[in-house]
Amino acid sequence: MRGNGVGAKFGKVAVLLGGTSAEREVSLMSGGAVLAALQAAGVDAHGFDPAQQDLHILKEQGFDRAFIALHGRGGEDGTVQGLLELLKIPYTGSGVMASALAMDKWRTKMVWAACGLPTPRYAILAGDTDWEAVVAELGLPIFVKPVHEGSSMGATKVTAASQLKAAWERAARFDDLVLAEEFIVGAELTVPFLAERALPVIRIEAPGGKYDYQNKYFTDETRYLCPSGLPAEQEQALQALVMKSARALGCRGWGRADLMLTGDGRPYLLEMNTSPGMTGHSLVPMAAKAVGLDFTALCLAILEDARLG
């Protein structure tokens, strides 16, 4: 069913969704929304869950492109990207190296710091860590999170040294590597990008200032402000910073950087997401809409940029 127009342009498309990571539930929502939009636009798109089918059969079944709507390990960390490279099936988003690097919050911060880009101070935690020394180095509060998880999985805000070990234990259930990060007080922002263009800044106001997994995906109480209300010059500076941060990691196609902005106007890069959510609560579609791209147009733009290498 190649058809004409859009269908012929993209060929047979696999929307990769679900997977086996801790973010499976969100990925199913993201992939379902993308799949519906592509099909409505006339694309010969099919849902494909790597947790239920072997990805090698994508080639056997004649797929021409893959839209990666997987989140977390196994989908956002370079592994799926590497397999698609071997199968020679062009895919959306960043390549193998950038996907793996951005998924690793520790090494992402090392690259940004080496490039002179602002990111909060940090330390790696282990069972034998001197908790008091970490507090002396980073101050309080401290944000503790797994190095390789997204959607705030296993993350804890620590307000006393006595809480650090429990926070480490919680994060360590998700990952062998656990990051302690200086807690930055200020406005929580996110800046998506599409191709070489930064989209509008979004300001996030979560209930109680807690933008966790629940408040990201399953509540209507979190407020997302787009336009952000920032002065135009400041917004442009933040967009430029995000594009620098993406280029430093080798990101391409689309993505989203999370950052904090202090009261005196200093930005701090937190994380880079190379396969952001595409749910009803997601932020890339919101920013795209602000510049005239509806959800379907956004999905088509991302798919059009699918490539190898």
Swiss-Prot record:
Cofactor: binding details: Binds 2 magnesium or manganese ions per subunit.
Ligand binding (Mg(2+) 1): D258, E271
Keywords: ATP-binding, Cell shape, Cell wall biogenesis/degradation, Cytoplasm, Ligase, Magnesium, Manganese, Metal-binding, Nucleotide-binding, Peptidoglycan synthesis
Cellular component annotations (GO), alphabetically ordered: cytosol
Name assigned to this protein: D-alanine--D-alanine ligase
Top-level taxon in the UniProt lineage: Bacteria
Family according to the record: Belongs to the D-alanine--D-alanine ligase family.
PROSITE patterns: ATP_GRASP, DALA_DALA_LIGASE_1, DALA_DALA_LIGASE_2
Pfam families: Dala_Dala_lig_C (PF07478), Dala_Dala_lig_N (PF01820)
Gene name linked to the record: ddl
Function recorded in the entry: Cell wall formation.
GO biological process, one term: peptidoglycan biosynthetic process
Cofactor(s) the protein requires to work: Mg(2+); Mn(2+)
Entry-linked InterPro entries: ATP-grasp, ATP_grasp_subdomain_1, D-Ala_lig_Van_CS, D_ala_D_ala, Dala_Dala_lig_C, Dala_Dala_lig_N, PreATP-grasp_dom_sf
Binding site for Mg(2+) 2: E271, N273
EC class (word): ligase
Cytoplasm in keyword set: yes
Binding site for ATP: 135-190
Reactions listed under catalytic activity: 2 D-alanine + ATP = D-alanyl-D-alanine + ADP + phosphate + H(+)
Cell compartment(s), UniProt: Cytoplasm
Keyword Ligase included in the entry's annotation: yes
Gene Ontology molecular functions: ATP binding; D-alanine-D-alanine ligase activity; metal ion binding
Pathway noted in the entry: Cell wall biogenesis; peptidoglycan biosynthesis
EC number(s) given by UniProt: 6.3.2.4
Signal sequence, start to end: none
